[in-house]
Amino acid sequence: MNSSHLNIYAATIPDRMHHLDLGLFNYQVTYTRELLKEWCGQIAVDELDNRLARIPRFPGLKIFKNGLENIKRFTADEFRNMMKVFVFVIEGIIKKHHKGTMDANNAKRTDKALVNAYYSWNKMYLCSRQEYFLESELDNFEV
């Protein structure tokens, strides 16, 4: 077999679950926790976990009673459940717990930027779950 003309990208099938749910979103949450710890200390990470644990029960929504303690063992469905609430969970944590690393105005802007990043992620994720796209929807992915 002559593999010099093999296009590996045409030979593989994209797997949204492993790429988006278990890959990128997992990384985004893990990195956010590291940033919170660096900017605000462990108290901000603990508050994030507490907020996740205090989400009221709702049919079909996974409750994270231990926060993100077991994030390495989360399933794609658990990450999708977290996507539904995470934008609300992180809002205000930086404003509340920022240390001397930034002033109040910068903390407010950073907090808002983090919330917007998760909001934009959710919009992109929902769009990517579709089978077919309109040209206008694809324009939203451009930087």
Language-model regions, residue ranges each:
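Domain-level detector for long, ordered catalytic/regulatory cores in large eukaryotic signaling
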Residues: 1-85, 92-93, 97, 101, ...
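General structural signal for alpha-helix termini and helix-helix connectors
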Residues: 88, 92-95, 127-133
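Alpha-helical bundle/repeat cores within regulatory domains of eukaryotic proteins
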Residues: 100-143
